[in-house]
Amino acid sequence: VEAVERQLTEFFKINDEVAAVAEKVGGLLPREPYVPTSISEDVYQSIRFAQLEHCMVVLHGDAGVGKSKGAQKFLKDHPTNAVGISITPSTGTLRSCIKRLARALRVPECRNKMDQMLALRNRLDGTNQVIVIDEAQHLKYAALEEIRSLTDDNPMTGEHGIGVVLIGNSEVYSRLQGRQLAQFA
């Protein structure tokens, strides 16, 4: 009981401190979490383009310029036909990436990568979904190739693919343009 009381006391203390700081700087912070900039608006429109054209778009640039904020705004504005995931160095592998995507789409997890990709494809085929992957520079080559395949039309059903947007630093673009360009196409 004492341990729980200590944890609750600490929790409420931290909440009070956060509220006090927010009150002090409240006038300095924007009221809206999204402030449109030319870059964030370009990101927003590029995601829409990928969705409408069922293609892959790669958006890259320096950190802090508005790429992620534009993507977050799009995902908030289109909750039924857009899904976003963020990749980290530990989730850039094919297995981790498709597991994260399956969770975001509420597709049951499968035992192996092939079955998981088939389940994802079945869920996505014929929809106007767009997948937004932030921090895409962490994707390994196999994950990039599988994600790219989601834009392809399904040869078995004829259903069109979906839009995919990769957002990251310039490394993601360099990797696609570099020695793997011939393989990736």
Model-flagged regions — what are they?
Residues 25, 93-100, 107-150, 154-165:
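Mid-core helix/loop region of P-loop NTP-binding domains shared across ATPases and GTPases
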Residues 56-60, 84, 132:
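Short hydrophobic/aromatic beta-strand immediately N-terminal to the Walker A/P-loop
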Residues 78-90:
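Conserved catalytic segments around the Walker B and adjacent sensor/switch elements
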Residues 80, 178-185:
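A short helix-turn-beta junction within AAA+ P-loop NTPase domains corresponding to the substrate/partner-engaging
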Residues 56-64, 139, 151-181:
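Sensor-1/coupling segment of RecA-like P-loop NTPase cores
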Residues 52-73, 89-90:
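Walker A/P-loop nucleotide-binding motif
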Residues 1-54:
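A short, basic N-terminal segment
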